[in-house]
Amino acid sequence: MKVYFTGSISAKEAYLPQYNRIVDYLKAKNHTVTYEHITNSTEESVRKMDKAHRLAFHHKIENWIKAADFMIAETSFPSVSVGYEIALALRLAKPVLVLYSEGDPPSLLTYHSYDRLHTEKYTSDNVGGIIDDFIHYIEGKHDTRFTFFFLRK
């Protein structure tokens, strides 16, 4: 599957090991992951972009999200840009897994309930299982249950 991964560029130095752990896990499961815009960019390089380059960068991000089957966002560090990307993915009807490793879940995301938005606290030990469960869910491999009513005559 095609995965769009995002996280805070400004907190990349602190969270790069987590970003890499998530991306490496997805790649090991043979998923195609778009992530280089996060791991190869710096806050300074983004800030130095002129308007034309920022718009082109934003257009690329939109196309990557459109092409993805789902999104994974590492949100341990608050980021307006990541929130925007999540909102865009949801608007495009993409399933989104929001991961955070410390503290409380992102408050604005937990306020709303969407069947395509899943928020999970993770550790290095359980992140793979969380990702697998999410992928099984969006592939439709989760349990389907029905309630049948029988009328007596």
Question: For each of these PLM feature ranges, what is it?
Answer:
Residues 1-153:
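Conserved catalytic or regulatory cores that recognize and/or transform ribose-phosphate-containing ligands
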